[in-house]
């Protein structure tokens, strides 16, 4: 396809998409931390570097991802950072807002985190703090929206700490419902241990 058409360049959203493409056309690759985070010298790391060090530009979604890429061996001069964009705020559907209000009835204060369930996102610290917070705020709730490798560990921790009434997990929900949860919450919690400006 590339050979037979007037393609000026290729933009890929994953390094694997470029791994087998043999062309002298300009190539740009988008990166996220999860997909490039392989120990230096491993076969996966070598494959990543073979692709990323042979493209025109590497677009990292954050400074954290850029620094991780450099640490993994990607040439710094090739990397630019473009943070993910956001959609304009839209008016929320009353039906979704009512559904969330029914789910959270009598729960207050309401904390929420929307992110992958990764170790570095640090959900467990919030969950552990709830053990003490529920003594002061018996109706407190922590809403976790997302999915990831740590999901089962977090659910196990919730059970061990007897916090099933205080922690709610949601995944594969619509944007409308997710935004309604955010709208009906009091505090958006970002407890990451990596990003310096976590709240």
Cite the ranges covered by each PLM segment.
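Nucleotide-activated donor-binding/catalytic signature segment of Leloir-type glycosyltransferases, i.e.
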Residues: 108, 144-145, 152-173, 187
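A short beta-strand/loop micro-motif in the catalytic core of glycosyltransferases
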Residues: 10-11, 54-63
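Short His-centered aromatic/hydrophobic patch
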Residues: 12-17
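Carbohydrate-associated surface elements
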Residues: 64, 85
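Acidic donor-binding loop of glycosyltransferase active sites
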Residues: 183-199
